[in-house]
Amino acid sequence: MKRTRKYQTALMAAVVSGLVFLPQAYAADTAYETDTVTVEAEGVDKYLVTTNTITAEEIAERGYRDLADILSQVPGLYMAPAAKDSKMVRVRGASSDQTKGYIDGIPAFPLTGIVSNAASDLSTIPADSIAKVEIIKGSGPVQYGTDYKGGVILVTTKDGEGTGKIRMSVAGGSNHTYDTKIGYSGSDKNVSYAVNLSKRYSAGYLENQMDKKIYFDGKIKFKTSSKSSLMLNGYYSDMEREVPQSVDPATGEYVLPSGPRWSVATGDGITPAQKKNNNATDWRFKGFKQSNIALQYESRPNDIWQYNVKYYHIIDENNLWVRNLLNTEGGSLPRFTHRAPQWYRSGWFSQGNGIEANASVAYDSKNVLSFGAKYIKLSWNTDENNSSYRRDGNDARRSFYVENAWSPDNRTRLTIGIRREDVTQDFRDNDAATQKTTSKSNAFDPVLNFTHDITKHDTIRLSAGRSHVFVGSKDAAGNIRSGYPVPKPERNSSYELGWKHKFGTKAEFDLTHFRTEVRDRITMVRFGGDCVLENVDKTHIRGLELSYRQTFSPKLSGFANYTWINAKDESTGMTTIASGLPTQMFNLGVTYREGKLRSTLLGRAMRARLDSNGEPTSAGYFAADLDLHYEPQTDLGLFLRVNNLFDTDYQYSWGSPADSTNFLLGVDMTF
């Protein structure tokens, strides 16, 4: 992990030389759209809150490889290093399990509603399958329910268009990495279709850091009439990933794990002392599978009224393996037994079905009324193999919403909506003979959004709304088992004030101030020997987002954004800093195009993350990536991605160092 000044100087000289000589490489001038995180006039902008849209063109130009990559440079979003080395997103300070994700309109990562863990690893979804990503922040649309505080992420996969074509990408690079993708798509008069398959592998830059992913998605859309369509779509992923030991940032040495010890049970020659002193290492996800299939019908009978109905089936499987240590390896176990196996597996599983119906009607020239309902039920179970301890249950949610959009004139837009959600959770321990315990909860939330065009270049927006976060059903089961009541839903009141200014057609500035007040915050507390969840805390979140983008010329464009967050927890009369969040983040990107060659430089800076006492848990840093793409002909492209260009030594979190300079070299082909 050592860095040398000589190496950095040589690398910088090579990069600068490449960028300097790019203008002389080719003489063709071509008009291009800007490659920045844009806020579009259509699409999610209709929600009248802060939104960001990243298109397929922008994804390709920046060399993003997966969804986590795409989201990493959106203002207000922090790619949080989560449990077991997974990548999850925190939106405006909200916990990673308080952001909803959808793929082609279907909920993704449903297990996060059961228990907050590493189930929602955003790096699972490859960027090559994505047509666009839309991020909704603030008091979002009521149609997505009430149980999100952070925001909503909408992923749309690519449609087929025109004559059937095969797309293929093959790449390899540092750490024995390979990344292969193949897709087929097309359309005729009444049918469009698209399928994508990808496989990625990396040995990792640390010991025990192998990462292997397989992903498939597909959709077929039938035009049933000139005003209606039927779509069958779905996705499947299978991941195997090793989780390395922590690395001390001061010494660069591996740190022996301090736990957990749940993979060891006393008895059969295993003493309480051996259980207490035993550590575990070589964590691994294996058999981490997710799949979703959906049938969606939409129709617009006339210019006044439209509706859609969707049904989906979800399966989620999450197997976590851990290897116990022997004495000779630093642990305390004298031998492996059935109470202390060499490899121990703990699994989380869920499957369920959902149905939704949404409609809107323009009942006069200034008003549109939208309404809908949803029902989703997930059945889940866990298996703790070593102790033969099993839990299972169900999580059922019913919701409806009504929203009216009013435009008194062509400069002002106002939406008022309400949503209701009812949650029923049941739980059973150990065996089928045990009677299930049931808990119920509900929430009723209003949302107000307003925008006004002050001038043709300036727009202000204001939003206020309330949301609720329900306790996960597996966590609720833990409270019931220990004899404690299930916590009430967490109440969140969100407000934002924003201003957008357009400098003609080539530049845009956006400023947003946001605030979230959390009541009845759900947190873990200890009563004697029991660790249970309870409503004891409050959280106050304040923040500021600034973003700017500009097309300087047909060849040169760029963007920059800045986020400031101040989050504080309040408990038993004491106020502390909310830990684990960086207070400031800055992103920038510059793209230069010359004929058939394109170069993009992306940078990110982050201030140190702090603990509850205000002490840094990791150092701040600045890092940059370079993406080069050469297209000798329309159906062939060569690319080089250099990550951590300046070999910055930094950590995602304490014990999780970032890779040094690494690369990926590949070719894209279309047949």
Language-model features, listed with the residues they occupy:
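Structural signature of Gram-negative outer-membrane beta-barrels, strongest in the C-terminal barrel
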Residues: 362-370, 374, 391-517, 551-554, ...
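Membrane-embedded beta-barrel scaffold of Gram-negative outer-membrane proteins
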Residues: 191, 304-324, 377, 451-453, ...
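Flexible loop and strand-edge segments within Gram-negative outer membrane beta-barrel domains
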Residues: 202, 229-295, 300, 315-349, ...
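Conserved C-terminal beta-signal and adjacent last beta-strands/turns
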Residues: 27, 223-224, 404, 462, ...
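Acidic, small-polar-rich N-terminal luminal/periplasmic segments of exported/outer-membrane proteins
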Residues: 32-163, 497
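N-terminal Sec signal peptide and the immediately downstream disordered periplasmic leader
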Residues: 1-74, 221-226, 293, 300, ...
